[in-house]
Amino acid sequence: MENLKELIDASITLKTIPVMIPVLFYFLGTQTSSDSIKTTFQDRKTFSYAILFQIIALPLLGLILSQIFSSNIFSLSIALVLLAPGGFISGILTHFKKGNIPLSVTLTSITSIVSPLTTVAWLGLISVNLDKFEFNITQTFIQLVLLIFLPYAVGYFVNYRGLSFVNKSSNFLDKLLKLYVLVITFTGPFELRDPLIKYFSDSILLVVSSIISIYLIQKLSSKLVKISKDDDRTILIEALCQNFPIVLTLSIILNIPEMAIFGIIYYLVTLLVVVPFSLIRN
């Protein structure tokens, strides 16, 4: 594990993550409009179901899987990865599948705002159930506020105020961040190719179990709640995809090197399996 930590520390890709995360969430804040949030809030049943699925059902599933696979080296990682659904890929899929884009944006916005509280709360619960995991509550909360909440709040505020530079910078940031995510999709796995190959067999069962469980739970619960097809599609996409940069950020903040490896494998499986399935399936 020490060798793995050295490889993670030496990764140029991972060193850029903490710098780019605030930029990413600032941009997200500038793209969030009050109108889209109001539109989403009008359907309270769908919004309540969607937000509860993200901040309660997914983390709870991660905790359950971590207990089932407690002897696996990545048992802690699966619990943490499911704290960060959505992300860049989910937004693209929602657009292509003609899902509920305001719902997708609002989900990401709300979960970003409350993420310091929800993440720390779930981390506390995880630490109780997994003896090998400990973390500093105050330090982690402050780091998440600085990296996620404040940049998002600043972006939302300047957009709400209609400041002239927002529109001028938005196109640049949009292209920059898309390029950045594309680049790290290749550079991250390339830099860490040896541990990815070494630990692939240990992680793949957890990843597949997670994806299948999410799919089945979401489809069953959405039928019980009786939400529209477009909303169902959007929520499923958000749940199946993983916020790659956030997962890597958590691995750095919490000093869990194996989580970076698991996060990359989870992300790659999402790209290779979930994305084609989502695009092909009606």
PLM features per residue range, with description:
Residues 1-282:
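Alpha-helical transmembrane segments of multi-pass small-molecule/ion transporters
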